[in-house]
Amino acid sequence: MDRHKKGVPLPSPGHRERKKARTREQLTEAAVRLFAERGFEQTKVDEITAAADVVPRTFFRYFASKDDALFGWYDLPRDATVAALRARPRGEGMVTALIAALEESVRASDAQRVIRLTGRVIAKSPELQGRLDAVRTIHCRDIANALAHRLPRSAAVVAQMVTAAVTTAYASTVDVWVASGASGPMSDYTAPVLKLASKIFASVNAQYVLR
């Protein structure tokens, strides 16, 4: 039946993309939870899809492997950070914008819960730790590019430098928070580090503002 001819509106591209994003998020959350409960090696793909209430072939539309499902979650805060940078107001200092975007990307309590679970799974495997380092390098580049896009072309190298310094300090602090087993919010650890970064790069922040 032609739904359009019968007067039934077809789903908009935005609706389809949101549905795909929800499915991907459901799979990553189910994967991380099961990895934490049962162990990474012990968890099977069909167990992940059952927990996410999708069929196994759906999993492979989004991920090539269990590793991709585990690290796929890290794309969510990266994407949120990039989106937040695009939305920051013109005239704002580049460091202020970067820090605000990082904080906004993990503000939800669910995000922090998944970060904690994911961190614990990865900490048990040197191989997964190596993969995390590679993922973080890629994400740092993506965030730096998003920041540079809001600055004059001559500031591209500065954007790379500041992003590398701030995100590395931020990620290291997140790792400390996960390892500590602290029950308090992640911001108890990250806020002082980001405040220090803001002071260190105060002159850069004043010199380079968003366009």
Predicted regions and their residues:
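C-terminal peripheral helix-coil segments that are non-catalytic and often amphipathic
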Residues: 1-10, 145, 149, 179-211
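Basic, helix-initiating cap at the start of DNA-binding domains
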Residues: 1-38, 42-54, 80
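Short amphipathic alpha-helical segment with a characteristic S/N-K-E followed by hydrophobic residues
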Residues: 27, 65-70, 80-81
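Residue-level preference for short helical/loop micro-motifs built around acidic side chains
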Residues: 41-42, 67-68, 76
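Short hydrophobic/aromatic patch on the recognition helix
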Residues: 54-63
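Hydrophobic alpha-helical connector segments
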Residues: 79-118, 124
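Hydrophobic alpha-helical bundle segments that form small-molecule/ligand-binding pockets
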Residues: 111, 137-162, 180
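Short, well-structured alpha-helical segments
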Residues: 159-167, 171, 191
